[in-house]
Amino acid sequence: MRVFKGEVTALPPDKSISHRAALIGALSEGTTEIMNFSGGFDNQSTLGVLKDAGITLRQELLEGADGRTVRQVIIESKGLWSFQPPSAPLMCNNSGSTMRMFAGILAAQPFASELIGDSSLMKRPMKRVADPLRQMGADLQLSPSGTAPICIKGSKELKPINYRLPVPSAQVKSLVAFAALHADGESRIIESVRSRDHTEVMLGLDSFEQDGERVIVVPGRKTVAAKPFYIPADPSAACFIVALGLLARGSEIIIRDVCLNPTRAAFLNILTDAGACLTIENQRVIGGETIGDILVENHAALEPLLITDPQLVAFIIDEIPMLAVLSAFASGRFELHNAAELRTKESDRIDALVVNLQRLGFDCEQYPDGFVVKGRRITPSGTVVIDSFDDHRIAMSFAIAGKATGCPIDLSDIDVVGVSFPNFFDLLDSLQV
């Protein structure tokens, strides 16, 4: 039997907050200091496109008071229009967050630019990026299939917008907010289903409830003053370690300094309701974000997970792969609906999960907006080849199952975990008793 115990202090800094801290720093007037910035491939892609678009920044590794190495990023900017025409297409690699959110900034710059990515990113839908920016007066061109490259002829004369998000998307909400900061007047973004709210928190935007919807108010052409940011540990990364502890009976793990923003930590409530023994300790607020420690103790069996609420799906969209694999291995069952957004991620995550779970002997059926795991028909006798589909979250979800249960698996691409969790495998090894 495999058992995992220990204290986790080296969880990756939050990916979402790191992206936004860098982009907001580039939009701010003055010097922005970001402590504990993520070293993952996606966040480094954001720094790369900022540098290529004329923003002055530097990063260095520092030794913290507890002996840990932390990454500091310093950004120097003169404000909203500090960007310069790039000499070549801006490479976003595999980072959809970089491409989508930076498009909102480039739409307001008085020059032409082009955003490209790797083969996976170039297949992902970008019409949701173009639609609101075109309504604001920007000229954006996509491929005939509505994907990148995104060719932008920016304009300093963007119009304010009242934009109702057609689907819950923190990336689209953020790109509209970034563009609206440059507009000549006040804009409003309307959410019928909430998504993660880091951009609003970090920019200090006002919001209110109206007719059951959330309205976010973005002032136009208002100076964004530079301020320091601290990046807490990524709850989406913490989910993998939580699952590790819950799958391996007798395990006890404490995960330090995790972002517990209510729009990000809903997976903890789901697991607690299913019988998981999870305790939040040392809870506090830093820079507007709730942070705390998660204690994972494996004392009881988990009930199967049934996830159908669209609002809940929006809050746990990145954690669903791990929750699905955890529920399948722990209880034999899992059911998900209203999650069609999963088909537009780094891979078609619904299909990727079903294909790999079936290889492991689970009886699965997929739908346009989700899938169901009905039980395990057989337990494979030999090593099972798992296809990561070039998707870091698919790779890590099945790696956790293999590590915790001893199920022999062979991952098709282990390097892809570097997108968000470079020290993933080293951390797992350090926790095994």
UniProtKB/Swiss-Prot annotation:
Keywords: Amino-acid biosynthesis, Aromatic amino acid biosynthesis, Cytoplasm, Transferase. Its EC number is 2.5.1.19. InterPro entries: Enolpyruvate_Tfrase_dom, Enolpyruvate_Tfrase_sf, EPSP_synthase, EPSP_synthase_CS, RNA3'P_cycl/enolpyr_Trfase_a/b. Phosphoenolpyruvate binds at K15, G96, R124, Q171, R349, R393. GO terms for molecular function: 3-phosphoshikimate 1-carboxyvinyltransferase activity. 3-phosphoshikimate binds at K15, S16, R20, S169, Q171, S195, D318, K345. Pfam families: EPSP_synthase. The active site is at D318 (proton acceptor). Monomer. Catalyzes the transfer of the enolpyruvyl moiety of phosphoenolpyruvate (PEP) to the 5-hydroxyl of shikimate-3-phosphate (S3P) to produce enolpyruvyl shikimate-3-phosphate and inorganic phosphate. Belongs to the EPSP synthase family. This is 3-phosphoshikimate 1-carboxyvinyltransferase.
